[in-house]
Amino acid sequence: MNAKEFLIELLKFKSVTPNDDGALNFIAMELSDFEAFFIEKEGIKNLLLTKKFKDEGEHLAFGGHVDVVPAGEGWSSDAFVPMEKESFIYARGAQDMKSGVAAFVDALKNADFKGARLSLILTSDEEGEAIYGTKAVLEWMQKRDMLPDYAVVAEPTCVKKIGDSIKIGRRGSINGKLLIRGKQGHVAYPEKCINPVHDFAPVLKLLAGFDLDPGSAEFSPSKIVVTDIRGGIEVCNVTPNDLKLMFNVRNSPDTSLEDVKSYVEKICHGLNYELELKQSSEAFLTNIDNKIVQKMNESVQKITHEVPELNTKGGTSDARYFAKYGVKVVEFGVCNDRIHAIDERVSIEEFEKLCLVFKDLIENF
C-alpha cells in the first residue's frame, strides 16, 4: 500500500494510551525486512525495528508513538474512522502523531541508506506517564550496545506551514507544591490567628511570573508560573489554617531544580512552609552545528522551500530520552494546529512532503 493508504489504516486503530490496539504489529508487518523486537515493560508495549546495512558507519533512528489521547465528544464523524475531506484526513492522531509514524515507515521502505543501521523506535505510552515507553527501549538498546548516533522524532512541530519549524531541544519541566502553615481562627479576632494568606501575600508578587534566568538565543527565560492557589474552607468568618500553592517552571539548562529551591527558600524566609519539587523532564539542546540539525535543515528546505526556525518552544516530548542517552536528536513533523482537539486533521499535502523530507534525509545522511 502507498503512504496515504498506510496512514489511513493506521488511523483506524483505537490506540488510546496505553493500548496500541494492534498498531505495532501492523507496522512491524509493513517493515517485514526489518528485525523486530517487541519490548514490554510494566504492561506497556513498545517496538524496535532495526536493519543493519554494514558493519562500520552511523546509526540513524526514528522515534515516535502510536498512542493517542481520547477523542471525547463533539466530533463531526467517528474519530477512529478516518474521513478524507477537502485535502485533509480527519481522525484522532492525524497530526499527533500517526502521520509522522506513517512518514517514517514510507521513508524506511523506499530510501537508499548509505550508513550502517536504520532503526524505528515506537511506543504506546507517550501521551501517558511516558515512563515505560521510549525510555525503556533505549535502556534495552544500551545494554546491547545498539544505541543510535542520531535520531529524529516526528512530533508535529510546524506552526503555520510544513517546514517552518524544527525543534533542536526542549525545556525541562519542574513542578512545585508550596504549603504555607498558619493557625485557623475567628475572623473577628485576627490577633489570635496566624493567617497564611496575609503572611504569603507579599511573597506572591516575588514568585508569580518571576524569571529565574534571562534566557538565551535558544531558550526563553525559566519562568515561575503559578497554576493553583487555595486556602480556607469557603466561608467568610474563619481564617485559613494553611495556604496551598502549585507552580511549574519550564526550565532551560541554565536553571536547575536546586536553583528553584534556593530562590523559593529565600523569598519564603521567616514563613512556616513546606516545599516539594519534582523534575518531571530535563532540558536538552542539540547544537545547531551537529550533523543531524544540519542535514534535517537541508532536507526541509529542499523539499518544502521554507527556511525553518530552529527552536526549543513548546512542551516536553520523548526526544528528551534520546538526549539523556547521548543521542543527538531533532524533532520535525506536520503542523500542530489541531493536536488533541476535536476534528483533528492533517493536510495530505503536508503529509506527502513529510514523507519526502524523511526520505531525503536518509538518502543524504
Curated annotation (Swiss-Prot):
Comment on bound cofactor: Binds 2 Zn(2+) or Co(2+) ions per subunit.
EC class of this enzyme? hydrolase
Q: Which domain of life is it from?
A: Bacteria
Which reaction equations make up its catalytic activity? N-succinyl-(2S,6S)-2,6-diaminopimelate + H2O = (2S,6S)-2,6-diaminopimelate + succinate
- PROSITE patterns listed in its UniProt record: ARGE_DAPE_CPG2_1, ARGE_DAPE_CPG2_2
EC number(s): the record gives 3.5.1.18
**Residues at which Zn(2+) 1 binds:** 65, 96, 155
UniProt GO MF annotations: acetylornithine deacetylase activity; metal ion binding; succinyl-diaminopimelate desuccinylase activity
Q: One GO BP annotation here?
A: lysine biosynthetic process via diaminopimelate
* Family under the similarity heading: Belongs to the peptidase M20A family. DapE subfamily.
HAMAP family in the record: DapE (MF_01690)
Protein name (Swiss-Prot/TrEMBL): Succinyl-diaminopimelate desuccinylase
